[in-house]
Amino acid sequence: MSYRRELEKYRDLDEDEILGALTEEELRTLENELDELDPDNALLPAGLRQKDQTTKAPTGPFKREELLDHLEKQAKEFKDREDLVPYTGEKRGKVWVPKQKPLDPVLESVTLEPELEEALANASDAELCDIAAILGMHTLMSNQQYYQALSSSSIMNKEGLNSVIKPTQYKPVPDEEPNSTDVEETLERIKNNDPKLEEVNLNNIRNIPIPTLKAYAEALKENSYVKKFSIVGTRSNDPVAYALAEMLKENKVLKTLNVESNFISGAGILRLVEALPYNTSLVEMKIDNQSQPLGNKVEMEIVSMLEKNATLLKFGYHFTQQGPRLRASNAMMNNNDLVRKRRLADLTGPIIPKCRSGV
């Protein structure tokens, strides 16, 4: 309370009256103190923070040329410092003499048989090119000329050694034809349980609506003939993955499911993998190359579900971590080993898988 009482007596003070009573020197001192209290003052450059330290009037105008002349005259009048050891002009060491370049040896003339000299004298550039290839002088020609000369008995290099090198003729590759699958017709055939329809390929058809893809998953629940279902590059997302997961829990015929290159997140992938224990017919699943990485946690959960499944033989996904990759590889290897044992023993009942680590 006493502190508040002390502040009340300063409440009615007139600041203009106090500042008007200060002298010029006191105002300058107050200004310097206020600048030091300014928090933004520390962020200014040094040249702007620093105030004038003196008010002394200049003794004369600034003349740059006269100042330079004065400095030059003062430098000339200053006596140079004498050397501690006087220079005598004595030369030490040997005078450098450049080495003479070796003379090129004179090439001796090679004497050939008259028939060879006449043949080489009348040979064309194309014939000389083939002769150089036969003699192994491949540095004188391009690779194409060299191999053409060796692969044929006739003269193939018509251009000669000094010709312009031509590139290999480009063979145009035609673009892949678009997917010709009729989406609506195929959906009706699945709903009607068409026995001739065993593979559904909707790859790279980007204009399929999400409700239509969910309708495909709903129709596959009761279908008894479709064994392969692929929707690569159809912009499928999590709702489609959820519908496919529900389909896997009821479908008992589908063997291959491919959902690569889509927009399915980790939650959708997990839902698909969690449906594997309810499905005993699926032997291959591909989920790689989604729009976003799944992450280490999702990969570990995927591996845990794969280790509990004894029917899946192929799993298409590239694990980013070494641990999940090794565990998934071992799980698929064990499942394939069970199939091999069942085939060799010709068993009809289920085989109990051997114990696995982490299950």
UniProtKB/Swiss-Prot annotation:
Gene Ontology terms describing biological process: actin filament organization; adult locomotory behavior; lens fiber cell development; muscle contraction; myofibril assembly; pointed-end actin filament capping
Lineage: Eukaryota, Metazoa, Chordata, Craniata, Vertebrata
Tissues showing expression: Highly expressed in the erythrocyte, heart and skeletal muscle.
Organism field: Homo sapiens
Lipoprotein found in the keyword field: no
Family: Belongs to the tropomodulin family.
Gene3D superfamilies linked to this entry: Ribonuclease Inhibitor
Cytoplasm is among the record's keywords: yes
Molecular functions (GO terms): actin binding; tropomyosin binding
Function description: Blocks the elongation and depolymerization of the actin filaments at the pointed end. The Tmod/TM complex contributes to the formation of the short actin protofilament, which in turn defines the geometry of the membrane skeleton. May play an important role in regulating the organization of actin filaments by preferentially binding to a specific tropomyosin isoform at its N-terminus.
PANTHER family noted in UniProt: TROPOMODULIN, TROPOMODULIN-1
Database matches in InterPro entries: LRR_dom_sf, TMOD
Region (Disordered): 36-61
Keyword tags: Actin-binding, Cytoplasm, Cytoskeleton
Record region (Tropomyosin-binding): 39-138
Name of the protein: Tropomodulin-1
Pfam families named in the record: Tropomodulin
CC annotations in GO: actin filament; cortical cytoskeleton; cytoskeleton; cytosol; membrane; myofibril; sarcomere; striated muscle thin filament
Subunit structure: Binds to the N-terminus of tropomyosin and to actin. Interacts with FLII.
Gene of this entry: TMOD1
Domain of life: Eukaryota
Compartment list: Cytoplasm, Cytoskeleton
